[in-house]
Curated annotation (Swiss-Prot):
Species assigned in the record: Caenorhabditis elegans
Disulfide bonds: none
Subunit structure: Homodimer. Occurs in an equilibrium of monomeric and dimeric forms in solution.
Name under which the protein is recorded: Globin-like protein 26
Tagged with keyword Heme: yes
GO annotations of cellular component type: cytoplasm; membrane; nuclear lamina; plasma membrane
Transmembrane parts of this sequence: none
Subcellular localization(s) per the UniProt record: Cytoplasm; Nucleus lamina; Cell membrane
Annotated positions binding heme: 77, 109
Gene for this chain: glb-26
Family from the record: Belongs to the globin family.
Length: 183
């Protein structure tokens, strides 16, 4: 397997119309307010319920995800998803914190590529499941700006998770190549 010494560059932040938000912000203040309200509504339904809805949707979109999420760890993952989303909501004013969190999680999951067959597109399935769950939990309250804000945030989160995952694969590949050279 060929090895490169460079690490992939982080994904660029999405371009938004000028004047809508501060330079380094993912969402403008109105969008943050909408997303926070949606999250409050979702988390009132019970955190594990929200997490299990997301997990169930992911597995429905890609059945092989169920192979990675052992039945014995489903409850754990349901709670982890909710805790992750809670941290994202708490950090909406600090996009660098969101990036770091997502990249760390993505990188930690790289080890599952070889052992369980995890693929990078599973992060997309997670994003789709989160977006659908937000739509469901908002019910009749849905309006365009709310969906747009959720989509922008989820896209950013997924891009950062994918970047961390790719970086983790790169680090693993470098380690494996080094180990092969030493043998």
């Amino acid at each position: 397997m060929g090895s490169s010494t460079s690490t992939p560059a982080p994904p660029p932040k999405k371009n938004k119309p000028e004047g809508r938000k501060a330079d380094n912000q993912i969402l403008n203040s109105y969008q943050k307010s909408i997303v926070r309200n949606a999250w409050r509504h979702m988390s009132q339904k019970g955190p594990s319920n929200c997490g299990s809805t997301i997990t169930r949707r992911m597995m429905a979109r890609k059945s092989t995800i169920g192979d990675i999420l052992d039945r014995s760890t489903l409850d754990y993952h349901n709670l982890q998803i909710v805790e992750f989303l809670q941290k994202v909501m708490q950090s909406l004013d600090e996009p660098d914190k969101i990036s770091k969190l997502c990249q760390e999680i993505g990188q930690k999951h790289a080890k599952y590529r070889r052992s369980k067959g995890m693929k990078i597109d599973y992060w997309d399935k997670l994003g789709e499941a989160i977006t659908e769950t937000i739509r469901e939990y908002q019910g009749w309250k849905i309006h365009r700006e709310s969906l747009r804000a959720a989509t922008v945030l989820v896209s950013y989160v997924v891009d950062q998770l994918r970047f961390g995952y790719s970086r983790g694969l790169h680090v693993q590949g470098s380690r494996e190549t080094k180990e092969d050279d030493e043998e």
